[in-house]
Every structure is written in structure tokens, then in C-alpha cells.
Amino acid sequence: MPREKKKRGRRAEKSQSKRKWEDDEVPTSPKRQRTADEDNEAQAGDDYIPLDTRDTEKEQEQGQEDDTPFYGLLDAEEQEYFSKASQTLELNSFEDDDDKRLFIESVYAEARGKELKIACRQVKTLFEKFTGHFLHLVQHRFASHCCECLFIRAAPIVTSEMEKPKDRKKERKQTIENNGEEGGQDEPLNQRSAMELFLGVISELEGNWGYLLTESFASHTIRVLLLILAGEPLAGQSNARVLASRKKENVDSITPTSQSELTIQGSRQVPVEFNNTLRRMISDLSAGLNSTYLQALATHPIGSPVLQVILSIELGCMGTEKLKDKNSVFRRLIPDDTLETKEEGVNFLNSLFYDPVGSRLLETIVRVAPGKFFKTFYKNIIRERIGSLARNEIASYVVIKVLERVSREDLESAIESILPEIPSLVQRSRLNVIKTIIDRSIIRSADTASLAKALESAYGEDGLARLKAILGVETKDKDAEDLAKVKPKAGTSPQHIHGSLLAQSMLQASGTLAAMIQSSFLTAPTETLIQIANNPTASRALQEALKPSKLNTQFRRQFLPRFYGQMCDLSLDSSGSHVADALWDATSDLIFIKQRLAQELADNEPALRDSFLGRAVWRNWSMDLYKRKRGEWMSKAKGLDNTKVSPSTADSSAGPAKSKLDLARARYAARAEQQEKPDGKDQGSRGKKQALSAPSGLLKAQ
């Protein structure tokens, strides 16, 4: 193939340098430059569409007018360093605590002077650096996450400073001694407390609540601030949904390793200044919002979560005084006489049942509303139509919250109303309402016989088909199994998760509901049981069925022999290994079955030791003890401790374990005391003293 002719040597270099010099001289040429419009006109043709630059010019003008500060960017080396540091901290692969401390100190030293570019500074120092910039940071896509994390980390510091004030001068002196003058120069003596820093953030954001309430990123930060000021848990199940958008940045993938995140699971003590600031903040957030605007905000995808937090704080933290206050957010959203007159307010509440966003607000109201309001709400709006609401995909979640609050009589009445809808719910795999009914029936001691009959008629009388329908397990051929091993595993469907949870709830309920699942397990062949055990979702129901209790002893006696010859395969599977561990507790009162299963593990020792999962099962079954000290393993298998020789020494927390000589002395003393009981009290005490001294005399004689 012919090649392109190219010049080589000094002539080519000379021509390239000349061309480069000419290119550099172009911008300084006095010749008038052709504008973009002229260029477009010159190139215009029949099929030419001119480029509209008006939008670009407007964006540039808006960008020039925007006063959002630019804090700079990290260079490539700094980005690579902090990215690797973040990965190292997430993996937490340090040899010891000193190694981790030295690594963190080196990261702090590298981050000095770059606090507004990254968020890896000590909490209060970083708080000081961010002060004055929070209004812009909370509206930034990534900086808003930094602010939320900073506030969550600083919340426990407020409580700790209230409990025990710290001597900041002494603290700074210790820092200088540990890290030198360079380590203590960034911590001034007049460093503000965490409470003052939070109050400074609120004062900095004041006057801007109106548009921050519905701002896509700042609204998340407002929710965090509200919960911190109220002292509410920041990691609870009820507040986790409204804190932040977890799907946006995949926040759940980061595993929390700090102890400060573990201290915010429950309610915290907050200073009085926080209560006053919280009332003022809620008042400013809702200032100028009438009932019409609040009802529109209830279905707003960004503003509704903030409204949920405000209502939960008003109804849960501020007492009953807010219910009587006509200016409160709750009373402006739902007036006092709304539920009685059945006017526009009732229509508004009915519309929330079927709205994806408004139903979440209704769940919050049902969860935190006072008992008087809830009874009226249930009587006038929900009770007569709870069956149709349970059938709806969105309204069913509100029904679940309602079922968690009703009394035993109302629960039984609700069950009778929902029973006609059971076949439809089973057919469409909407099992969360049924699971909630079973859970609440266990707590309220309600009758579930009618529910069991409805479920049996919906799933059929065939036990194996019923088990497969509930757990979502299908029989696979060998070719299909080989194909599944090659293909990547897909995520578990919600229908299978709900089915597994329903089976677990049925097993926890005594009577007919548990018998339905147990009989289904007994009718299933061994291949199906192994398939269920190796399924990460369905195996949970199998583990629940294996939990020992007095009511399922007969079931376990019939069911456990089905695992003979399967222990090795179960131990080498990621889900089946959990079932193998559950078999240890399941055979606590069936020692002959436990010995048979343990012998299977011992026969397959090489395969188990070559696998990480197999080694875990080997350790949990104490197989080393089984091979070397069979008697001690038998005591452990029966649930007995070696130190528990007699009832008098059963309490191991009373003192250290007694030696054989001490135990012999105790038995000798007890025997002597029984022999001296027919005599008088004085003789009994004298005989006891002689008995206690007898073993020591015998020891000296030896």
C-alpha cells in the first residue's frame, strides 16, 4: 500500500517551527476578525441550519451575574492521592490502630489548605472553614453531601460537650505535645463550640428558607438540620427515607466505620438554644404558607419530605400544644373540624392515598398523630374502605401503618374486611399487607384461623406447589442450572423478598399458619430443599423453620434427616452455609442427628478446609474439638459447659472456675453438713468447721 510522502530531518523541523510561529502570531494580527454571524452567513446553503447562540450568550451572562464562589480544583496528583486514601479508609485494611492513626494524620497533613476543595478535615476545624459559605455549599450537588456528613458527625459532639465541658487550652496543649507546633497552630484558643457552630449555620441560612425548601440539593440538608436540632435519631428506620436521596449518589454502598455514626441511633439530648432555634426555623420555613400552598407542597417531590420532617417534629417532639395552635403546620394542613364536616379537607386526604408522594406524607401523619386524631381519622375515612385501600398498590402502604396502630378489636374487624381481597393480593404478589396482618396478630393475640383458610384457598392445598409459589422457587433442569452458573446473577425481585418474609412471619405464628409452611417443607423433595437453601432469599425462610422451639420438635425430628449427605454441598455455598450453621442450633435437643451431620463434615474435611465458607462452617461446628476431644464436643453440643459440674457452681459469673480439689472440698463439706443436720445448731456449725478443715488436714497428711 503506498505511503504518504513526508519530509524528514532539519527541513521538516524548520517548516514545523515556522508554521507554529505563524499560528502564534495569528491572535495579534491587526486584521479584523470575522464574527460568528458572518461565518454562518458565508456557509449558509439550502440544507444549512444556523446555530442559535442566543441561549449560550444568556447562559454566559447569567454565569457572570451569578455570585456563586469558585473554590478551585484539585490537580491530578491530589485527586489520585485522595481517591486512593478514600479507598484505603473504606477497605479498613490496617494492621493495627496505630497504623490507621498514622495514615489519617498523613491525610490531614496533606489536606491542610485544601479544606474548601475536599471534605477530609477534622470536624470542628472543617466547620470553621465552611462558615460563611454554607448558603452556596448546600445548593451544590457534591458539597451538599459533604455538609450533611459534617452535620451528622458533629451532632454527637454537641451532646458530649453538654455532658462534660472540655478544657480547650489543655486540649490544645496536648495536641501541640503530640503533633508539634505545626499540629496545633490551626486550632485557636477561642474555637467555638459545636452548638455555636450549628447556630451559626442557621443564622447564615436565615432569610433563604423559602427557595431552599424546594431546592433539589439544599432540601436534604434542611432535613438533617431539623432532625439534629430536635435531637431525633438520624439513622432510624422512620427517618432514613426522608434524610437524603440514597439512589442518587449510591450512598448506601459506603459502610460506616466511625463510632460517631453509632451514637446517633437513638434520641440525643440537645441544649435549650436548639429548641428555640428549631421553633424559629419551623416558623420561618412555614411563614406565608397557607392551606392551599401546604396542600400543594404535600405532593411536591422535593418539598414533601421536608414537610414530613416538620410534621414529625411538631407532633412528636413539641407536645400537644402544637395541636391546639391554629398557626401550626399541622393545623394549617388539616384544620380541626375537617374530619367531622367532610368537606374539602377530606377530599384532600383521600387524594393523598393514591399519590406516590402524598401517601408518604400520610404515612408520617398516621405514625406520629395523637391518638384522638388517629381514632377520628380511622373511623371517618379508613374503616369502611380498608379492603379497597389494601388492594391498591400505593394506598396499601398507608394501610400497613394504620394496622400497626389499631387495637385488637379494630384489627380483627380489619382482617374480616381484607379477607375477600386475599386471592387478589396473592395473585398480584402484594404480600406486604398480609405479612403485616400476621405480625400484628401475633402482637395483639388476634385470631388468625380465618386468614389461614383464606391463604390455603388462595395458594392451593398442594404443599409443594404452595411452597414454590410463596418462595418463588422453580424447578430447574441441569442444563438450566449450568446456564445460570455462566450468566451473571441478577438482583432479587421484590416479589421473592416479600414471599420469603411472608413465610417467615407464618412460621413465627403458632397454629395453622406455621403448619402450612412446615407441611410444605416436609412434602418437598431433597433437590427442592437444596435449591431453596442455596437461594439467598428463600433460604431465610428455611433458617426460620429450623429455629428450635418446643412447638416444632416433632417437625424438626422428621425434617432434619432430609439433610443427610448434603452437609458438604451446603457448606460450600454462600447461602447454604448459613443453613449449615442453622443446623447446629436446630439439633440442640436431637444429639444423634447432630453427630451424624458432624461426621459428614469430618469425612469431607479436605474440601471444607480449601474453601473460605467451608472453614467458617467447620469453625462454627467446632470440628477441631470433635476430632480431638469428643467428650468436650458432646458437652458443647448438648449445651453444657465444662465448668458446670454442680448446681452450686452453675453461675460462672460468681467467680473464677474452681479446680478439681476445690470441687472435692465443696462436695465433702456438703456431705458433712447433711450428716450433722439432726444435731443442734451449735453442733451443726461445729461439724461444718471441722468438715471444712478436714480436706486440708488430709492434704498435709499426704
Curated annotation (Swiss-Prot):
Sorted alphabetically, which SMART domains does this protein's record hold? Answer: Pumilio
- Comp. bias (Basic residues): 1-11
- Segments of this protein annotated with the region Disordered: 1-68, 162-189, 639-702
Biased composition annotated in UniProt, kind: Polar residues: 643-652
Location of this chain's protein in the cell:
Nucleus, Nucleolus
Pumilio repeats mapped onto the chain = 288-325, 344-379, 380-416, 520-561, 562-599
Say yes or no: keyword Oxidoreductase present: no
Could you cite one Gene Ontology molecular function of this protein? RNA binding
GO CC terms in record:
90S preribosome; nucleolus; preribosome, small subunit precursor
Q: Which Pfam families match?
A: PUF_NOP9
**UniProt keyword annotations, A-Z:** Nucleus, Repeat, Ribosome biogenesis, rRNA processing
User: What is the first-listed, main subcellular location in coarse terms?
Assistant: nucleus
Q: In what ranges is there compositional bias, type Basic and acidic residues?
A: 12-22, 52-61, 673-685
Q: Name one GO biological process term.
A: endonucleolytic cleavage in 5'-ETS of tricistronic rRNA transcript (SSU-rRNA, 5.8S rRNA, LSU-rRNA)
**Which SUPFAM superfamilies does the UniProt entry name for this protein?**
ARM repeat
Instruction: Show the PROSITE patterns listed in the entry.
Output: PUM
State the similarity comment: Belongs to the NOP9 family.
Q: What does this protein do?
A: RNA-binding nucleolar protein required for pre-rRNA processing. Involved in production of 18S rRNA and assembly of small ribosomal subunit.
This chain belongs to the protein called Nucleolar protein 9
The organism of origin for this protein: Arthroderma gypseum (strain ATCC MYA-4604 / CBS 118893) (Microsporum gypseum)
